[in-house]
Every structure is written in C-alpha cells, then in structure tokens.
Amino acid sequence: MAVEGLKKTLVLGHRNPDTDSICSAICYAGFKHQLTGENYEPCRAGNVNPETQYVLDYFNLKAPRLVENVKTQVKDIEIRKTKGVSRGISLKNAWGLMQENNVVTLPCVTEEGLLEGVITIGDITKSYMNLYDSSIISKACTKYANILDTLEGSMVVGDSEAYFNQGKVLIAAANPDLMEFYIEPHDLVILGNRYESQLCAIEMEAGCIIVCEGAGVSLTIRKLAQERGCAVITTPYDTYTTARLINQSMPISYFMTKENIIEFSEEDYLDDIREIMASKRHRDFPVLDSDGKYIGMI
C-alpha cells in the first residue's frame, strides 16, 4: 500500500490496539490508496496481542509498523528547497540568486552536498560597509573570473582562473610621476586609456590593471604586461562605477558564517526546536538528512 519515496499519510487506531483497531487501519489505508492513488500506511499505536497476531498470520499479513508518537517532525513540514551554492561564487551572484528566489539566506555546500556555511543578505550588506580596507579583495582571494563577470570585462592578458591574492586596489587618478609613490608590487590598478599610466603601473610591478570605458590596450602594453606577469582586464564601465562594483566580485566564502551554524535534522521534532528558532534573529535554518547532507531550509 505504501509506495516508497512518496509522502505518507499514517493510518492508526487507538492505543493498546485490539484486532478491530489493527484490521481497520489496514483496510482503511488500502481503501484510501485504491481510491486516491496516494500513499497511505497502516500503523499501530501499541503492541500486537496474541489474538490479533493469530488473525494476521491466518491471512499472511505483517503487523503494521509501530508508531510511538505522532509528534510533528521537520520532515513533515514544508522544507524550502533553496539550492546550495559554491563557496567561490561572487557576492554579486549571491545577491542575484537571493532576489531571484526571494530568499535572504543561501547555503554554501560542497560537491558532495555537505554544508560548509551560510550567507545572509545582512552579510552582503556589511561587506559594502568595509570602505577603508583597500586590500580586502586580495584577502578574500578573489578569482579573476569573478572580477570579469562583475565588471562585464574581458581578459586581455592573464589567466581568468588565477586569483588576485596579494596587494591592494587603487585608482590611478594622478599623473605617472605621483603614481610611482603609491603603486606597490602586486597591486590592482584601475585606470583609463592613458598609455603613460598603464606603462607606469606595469613598471611598478602591479599585479593587474583594469582599463576602463572599453578603451583598447596597445600591443606594446600587452607585450610588456605579459613579460612582467601583469594581468590586463578591460571593462566598459567608467572608473567610478568600476571602483564601486569591484567589491561585489569577492567570493562569499570570505563573509559567510562557517562556525556555530544552527542546523536541524529532518528527524528533529518541532516541539524540540521551536524555542531555538524563536531565540535567534535570523529566519532561515538549514536542514540535513540522515547522512548529514543539506536538503533545504526552514
């Protein structure tokens, strides 16, 4: 009667069941399944007495499963199937997924489905408030592919799968004479189409230059950047927009909560977790299956 894998409705009689109670549960579950095609399982709320066991044996039937309580478990309520994301996706993409799916929390999972962390809309908002750490993008170990995606840019020189993991981010607003005093090795420099500024940044051993407003990059600059190991990216955005957007390229792994995550098993009873949920300020909690793998949010 019960079809494996489908959600079940349990059919029970009274406690300390007699033969009528158990036979009624078996018959009614079978009747409802035949009538609706849905999943009904006969159960019992106590031990089988000898008389009932004799009847079951006579008709070659197994005793219904014992159900010791009918408390609501996590698996009995709606679990929102918020898809897990990789730790390497950018803040921009995480924000987009939140808006698209109308959620405020995203779970970060491994390829095996294990929960690594969670990131909330509040975490993303806080990341925008860290205005004074010009090296935060390298501290976050940001992939160039994320920068390209965020800035809608093109990789002119370098490997998009490499990481920007050293140096600070700065805008080359001054002339080359002054740039020499504040550009340091491995820095990421946002600049315009001035040949002299691009040349100066590369000679000062910048790790990457971002050329704004869709400006072309000369063959000489490309060749020198290649020789010096300097990545070159072009973007259609102006320097102001580029500077505002680039922080959104950082991976969520740098900002997500990794420790002391409040998570529940699908076998947990709601009565046991209700108080825990009410005591926390956030609204979404990950749910794990019996193998410890992420299955959704409540």
Go through each PLM region and give its residues:
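Long, charge-dense
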Residues: 134, 222, 227-257
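Short, small/polar residue-rich loop motifs at catalytic or cofactor-binding pockets
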Residues: 101-103, 279-282
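Short beta->alpha transition motifs characteristic of CBS
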Residues: 114-130, 237, 282, 286, ...
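Bateman/CBS regulatory modules and CBS-like beta-alpha motifs in cytosolic regions of diverse proteins
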Residues: 67-97, 109, 144-157, 163-195, ...
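Juxtadomain coupling helices with adjacent low-complexity linkers
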Residues: 123-164, 229-230, 234-236
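Short, ordered loop/turn segments at secondary-structure junctions
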Residues: 15, 45-48, 68-71, 111, ...
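Short hydrophobic alpha-helical runs that function as membrane-insertion/retention elements
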Residues: 41, 64-66, 106-107, 189-191, ...
